[in-house]
Amino acid sequence: MPKYYIITYGCQMNKSDSEKVAGILENLGYTPSEKMEEADIILLNTCSVRERAEEKVFGKLGELRKLKKRNQNLLIGIFGCMAQRMKEELIEKFPHVDFVLGSYKFTELPKILESLDGKKKVVLAEDIPSPQDVDFRVIKRENKFQAWIPIIYGCNNFCTYCIVPYLRGREKSRDPEEIIREVEYLASQGVVEVTLLGQNVDSYGKDLGNVDLADLLVEIHRIPRIKRIRFLTSHPRDVSDKLIRVVATHPKVCPHWHLPLQAGSDRILRRMGRGYTYSEYKALIEKIRAEIPKASFSTDIIVGFPGEEEEDFLATRRALEEIKFDTVNLAIYSKRPGTPAANYEDLIPYETKKRWFDELENLQRKIIYEKNLSRVGKEEIVLAEEVNPKNPRELSGRTENYRLVFFEAEKELIGKFLLVKITEARLWSLKGEVIREVDL
């Protein structure tokens, strides 16, 4: 039987897309290959959010050139956001690539594979990407107890730095009944935790008119075998009081919020087109904490946006000190072709951006370690997810607040909920001891 190998770059939505592609290929008779060198088809699911993500793909394509020389029958395909952005340019730069599929076009994979003859190159990408769903029963999930579930595609916000709306299209919500059918099916297959995905997940239902994310969470909460529900990514401007109340009053909905701040300076937030001020963002955090005291928060911060000055950077630093996020994803600004910010000329020298980045990273290290220290001695319910690759005697899993915990346990407990006593604080994780298995 022919073998496939998929390499995934980027966000959780890309991970979900790769699971769909794996399911499509297995439906065609392919089996997964543990080693890239032994595969008959290699697919790269790509990301264009930052230049560095694209550079990783270029490096991998250079590596695959050598593999193709050794095996002329090897098929190499590229899909995802980078494929949507570059289209034919990828074939021109890397002639050993056989096909390029833009956003959502991986659904055409069966036809593409049938049409390839070893000489013909295929590029399939729409100017305006339009989502196409895959039968959820054929999706090859990464594991048997957790599942990604896209509920809304695209984004309407058009932040000045972001290329995603151009590559993923406008917002399009999935039918709520179809989503519920998918969750019910997954529950019947043993899934206990679902994560609802969207580039802007709390915009769900705006284009449908009669449902929103809060309504959907309530419906999924009614499904008995589902024990945990997560959702991401949220735009701060779209978090409603209704959504906060639903998270507060429905115990299966994890009280973890991913709310990208991007900057603590109102001037830079305006330039980014984020649609809120720092004081409005902070008020939202305070409102959530007042209603959900155990809520945790992660965020994204862009360092060195064009025109950023020292006082803007210091405002962002103060924001991190005031809010004390549980996780901060820091990124140095990366110019993306076709976005309004790509035309801004007041660029920041790399040395300045790196200094600011290092300063924020060091600050966040202190904050997260202090937060982790405060967990020592407490008991947490953890879903055991996988064997620790650095220590086969340990498993790792996450709390409802998305804190990573390592603990000694047999691998047979993977997929189970465990009561774990936290015994040690580490920089990015916690260490614990299993007390017992729990039935939620």
Curated annotation (Swiss-Prot):
Organism (species): Dictyoglomus thermophilum (strain ATCC 35947 / DSM 3960 / H-6-12)
Chain ranges of the Radical SAM core domain: 141-370
Residue ranges annotated for the TRAM domain, each copy included: 373-436
CDD domains associated with the record: Radical_SAM (cd01335)
The enzyme's E.C. designation: 2.8.4.3
Subcellular location: Cytoplasm
Domain MTTase N-terminal: 2-118
Top EC category: transferase
Binding, [4Fe-4S] cluster 1: C11, C47, C81
GO MF annotation, one: N6-isopentenyladenosine methylthiotransferase activity
GO cellular component labels: cytosol
Reaction(s) catalysed by this chain's protein: N(6)-dimethylallyladenosine(37) in tRNA + (sulfur carrier)-SH + AH2 + 2 S-adenosyl-L-methionine = 2-methylsulfanyl-N(6)-dimethylallyladenosine(37) in tRNA + (sulfur carrier)-H + 5'-deoxyadenosine + L-methionine + A + S-adenosyl-L-homocysteine + 2 H(+)
Pfam families to which the protein is assigned, alphabetical: Radical_SAM (PF04055), TRAM (PF01938), UPF0004 (PF00919)
Binding site for [4Fe-4S] cluster 2: C155, C159, C162
CC cofactor note: Binds 2 [4Fe-4S] clusters. One cluster is coordinated with 3 cysteines and an exchangeable S-adenosyl-L-methionine.
Primary localization: cytoplasm
Quaternary structure and partners: Monomer.
Keyword Iron in record: yes
Protein name: tRNA-2-methylthio-N(6)-dimethylallyladenosine synthase
InterPro entries referenced in this protein's UniProt entry, alphabetically: Elp3/MiaA/NifB-like_rSAM, Methylthiotransferase, Methylthiotransferase_CS, Methylthiotransferase_N, Methylthiotransferase_N_sf, MiaB_methiolase, rSAM, rSAM_horseshoe
